[in-house]
């Protein structure tokens, strides 16, 4: 079992995966790859987090590399131009910081602070250039990352990305509502909400600037392409739930597939873990089947025209990266400090976040 170290070379090192979380098929059939830009990516994103003041300097120094945010993206968007991958990695790092702010706002009951942030993010998404110097560094960092993402493809792609992220913001608001009221959503409601809070279609949209081609709706919505994209994201979300379950139970959270199964289907913890794992394994099996259909679709697009060749190449590259997402997500969960709950002083409080409880920031 190999994973990449936190240094500047891509020499694999052994990582022990707990038996309950180990997926031999991922280790055997989904070889891990890493974008060659990764060492520079890690360094530049670390600098960006400091410059944008998204994390305190001492926490960046101590935790940023070990959180492995850049490793996750560098293992996904293979073939992306360096500039595109850098913009995606910075946006992804911002997303994790936003997720942590959202969590702390819930923990400390900062409803007003969350409401203000929610409104500002909606506004900044539509006009990032007007928010680059906002007093809330989270808003300014978001504006910077979105402005850069908007530079790669036509305005129609930007509008779709914005539309998808507006729904993500609203899904985070629904999660805020549920968690502050102790509401555990039913399984189907949770699965629908999880597709939004995990930003399934955002990460799928970002495959397009990575391959340098905006896909027309007829291609993007083709059943094989769309199903492959969904399965890769479902795997990531549900494997995240499997790995996060101890942390989220310790933190009295309510948003986890395992917690919904325990609450609404009367499963024991052991049974819930087994059911989440079963769903994770089904995603892998079904992806391996639909991947063939998606690649066959890519071949069909190559109709002898220049445009057909471009679309065929883009779909093939994107489906290859959907495959990469499985291995990148898998190893991320066993390398990143986000999931090393047993090493924290307080299992309910990540050491890499600002846990300021006073006031509404």
Swiss-Prot record:
Its EC number is 4.2.3.37. GO terms for molecular function: epi-isozizaene synthase activity; metal ion binding; terpene synthase activity. This is Epi-isozizaene synthase. The Asp-Asp-Xaa-Xaa-Asp/Glu (DDXXD/E) motif is important for the catalytic activity, presumably through binding to Mg(2+). Pfam families: Terpene_syn_C_2. Gene3D superfamilies: Farnesyl Diphosphate Synthase. Pathway: Sesquiterpene biosynthesis; epi-isozizaene biosynthesis. Binds 3 Mg(2+) ions per subunit. Can also use Mn(2+) and Fe(3+) but less efficiently, and other divalent cations such as Zn(2+), Fe(2+), Co(2+), Cu(2+) and Ni(2+) are nearly completely inefficient as cofactors. Belongs to the terpene synthase family. CDD domains: Terpene_cyclase_nonplant_C1 (cd00687). Keywords: Lyase, Magnesium, Metal-binding. It catalyses: (2E,6E)-farnesyl diphosphate = (+)-epi-isozizaene + diphosphate. A motif (DDXXD motif) lies at residues 99-103. Catalyzes the cyclization of farnesyl diphosphate (FPP) to the sesquiterpene epi-isozizaene. Mg(2+) 2 binds at residues 99, 103. NCBIfam families: IsozizSyn. Mg(2+) 1 binds at residues 99, 103. Mg(2+) 3 binds at residues 240, 244, 248. Its cofactor is Mg(2+); Mn(2+); Fe(3+).
